[in-house]
Amino acid sequence: VEKWLGLALKDGYRERVMLVWQCGAYRRDYKTSMQQFDESLRRVGTDRFDIWSFGELIYDNDPEWLDDHGGLDAAQEARDEKRIVGIGFSGHKAPHIHMKLLQRGFAWDLVQMPLNPLDATYRSFERQVLPEAVKRGIAVISTKPIAGGAIARAKVVKPEDALRYCFSLPVSSVQCAADDRALLKKNLKLATTYTPYHAGEMDLVRQKCRPVAGDGRFERYKSTQEFDSPLGLAVHGFRP
């Protein structure tokens, strides 16, 4: 995938995009983090990424591992060498882990979190983490805007209404997968033509979702290991 990305960024397109690199070194150690970083630069065919983002910070000891195992040192070294500009992190499971990272005293540049109308009711990143990130001036990327497709299965709001809900939050970008060009074009059109929901409309969308959102049945990535990576499970002592 990174090689394909490199091909797409030739002929001047690299300067027109912001590249966020997600570090998949789940032991959070210096050596593996830096090795993966260098390999990704080579595959993409660039000398820098804009943001280094630590992926899948979902275990309570992940914040300590970043410090104790040297992963954060690797990112700071890459920034000192001007091979990245900013440092961030992502996770999909527990708002309190995001808060733990935000409150550790490190000046994060980016945070990625699952935001959608279901999240507002269940273990909510929108209510617990988003205000703190905004207060600190940290850029936010909304992930899982349709809850991995669960919004469509829940049949309480349309997927396009869920996207519009996320676009109306104080975020820098919304990350939404598309499995074909038609859906991609539809999402892009919505992103460039939507009218933000006002506060009353946001509340109405939340209310529509509340009856099926409270037990987390449509956000199982928060409460189960079904969506955790095999490598992440293994390094934390779980059987993938």
Where are these regions (language model features)?
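Short, well-ordered alpha-helical microsegments
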Residues: V1-L5, A94-M99, R181-L184
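Structured C-terminal cap/extension of enzyme domains
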Residues: L7-L9, R104, R127-P240
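Short hydrophobic/aromatic-enriched beta-strand-loop microsegments
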Residues: E15-L19, A107-P114, T195-E201
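N-terminal small/glycine-rich loop or linker at the start of catalytic domains
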Residues: R16-C23, S53-E56
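Glycine/proline-rich, positively charged
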Residues: R27-Q128, V134-I141
